[in-house]
UniProtKB/Swiss-Prot annotation:
Its main location: membrane. This is 4-hydroxybenzoate octaprenyltransferase. It comes from Hydrogenovibrio crunogenus (strain DSM 25203 / XCL-2) (Thiomicrospira crunogena). The gene is ubiA. InterPro entries: HB_polyprenyltransferase-like, Prenyltransferase, UbiA_prenyltransferase, UbiA_prenylTrfase_CS, UbiA_sf. Pathway: Cofactor biosynthesis; ubiquinone biosynthesis. It is found in: Cell inner membrane. It is an enzyme of class 2 (transferase). The chain crosses the membrane at residues 20-37, 96-116, 138-158, 166-186, 211-231, 234-254, 262-282. It catalyses: all-trans-octaprenyl diphosphate + 4-hydroxybenzoate = 4-hydroxy-3-(all-trans-octaprenyl)benzoate + diphosphate. Its EC number is 2.5.1.39. One of its GO terms (molecular function) is 4-hydroxybenzoate polyprenyltransferase activity. Catalyzes the prenylation of para-hydroxybenzoate (PHB) with an all-trans polyprenyl group. Mediates the second step in the final reaction sequence of ubiquinone-8 (UQ-8) biosynthesis, which is the condensation of the polyisoprenoid side chain with PHB, generating the first membrane-bound Q intermediate 3-octaprenyl-4-hydroxybenzoate. Belongs to the UbiA prenyltransferase family.
Length: 285
């Protein structure tokens, strides 16, 4: 029997009250669905991908906290997480992770066999990412691959194939993760250095703002390429221009060289994904 406090701890573990991660997974998946279908995708597939984004992001948070269980207690921002405080055990967290993965897999079973096969990659990347912080300064790239994996799955679900153009969207989404998760890592930089945890924020050092700016420029070029590949019109390119405006704002926030401002830039990034989605939707009406 799960008590009320335990239920709250499980919900806290999923960060369901902080939907930013869901948005960052969901928007690129919806870009891909709309582009693959050249308009509104079938409602059943749309619902599966929305629910899948919520469940797999939750699963990713659970396995992330499991991987960081020996570190979170020493970091100001994470010391109240359920595994760090002992509200939940390691065994309970692992069981919960596998239950969430089974729920997500149950959804995927309603799709074609190719998409089912690709879904195994999503689980593998979700498990791999949190452990990369100990081995490479580029864990953000692994996060990007995990968040972008819904893109080939979306094309597979709609077209039963993954054309090379889908991998362009995948690449842009991966670069986007380098942008927003580096800003996120700035907030934990001081604690991460003490604990020996690696990140792009540490790797880039004093040049973090300009390197994020470089990746933002790569993203904008990628968005322009996507527009050309899929024959999109000025409606889409208008959304790219608005996205560029958001990036200018993020650069302004990063210029303060303050963890709180960098975290605000991270949170604001989901508007980039949403405005691009709106541009694609309007263009494919």
């Amino acid at each position: 029997m799960i008590h009320k406090q335990q239920l709250q701890a499980y919900l806290q573990l999923t960060r369901i009250d902080r939907p930013i991660g869901i948005y960052l997974v969901l928007w690129p998946a919806l870009w891909a669905l709309w582009l693959a279908a050249d308009g509104m995708p079938p409602m059943s597939i749309l619902i599966i991908f929305i629910l899948g984004a919520v469940i797999m992001r939750s699963a990713g948070c659970v396995i992330n906290d499991y991987a960081d269980r020996h570190f979170d207690g020493y970091v100001t921002r994470t010391c109240a997480r359920p595994l760090a405080t002992g509200q939940l055990t390691e065994r309970q967290a692992l069981k919960f992770f596998f239950v969430l993965c089974l729920l997500a897999f149950g959804l995927v079973l309603f799709l074609n066999p190719f998409t089912i096969l690709l879904s195994l990659g999503a689980v593998g990347l979700a498990i791999l990412y949190p452990f990369m912080k100990r081995h490479t300064f580029w864990p953000q790239a692994f996060l990007g691959a995990a968040f972008a994996w819904a893109i080939p799955m979306a094309f597979a679900a709609i077209q039963n194939q993954v054309p090379w153009q889908a991998w362009v969207i995948f690449g842009v989404t991966l670069v986007w993760a380098l942008v927003y998760d580096t800003a996120y890592a700035v907030a934990d930089k001081e604690d991460d250095v003490k604990l020996g945890i690696k990140s792009t924020a540490i790797l880039f050092g004093d040049r973090v703002q300009e390197i994020i700016g470089f990746f933002q420029a790569i993203m904008l070029l990628g968005f322009l390429w996507i527009g050309d590949l899929f024959g999109l019109s000025w409606l889409y390119y208008g959304s790219v221009l608005i996205a560029a405006g958001f990036f200018v704002y993020h650069q302004y926030l990063l210029s303060f060289d303050q963890p709180q401002k960098a975290f605000k830039a991270f949170l604001n990034n989901h508007w980039v994904g949403l405005v691009i989605l709106i541009g694609i939707m309007l263009d494919t009406l």
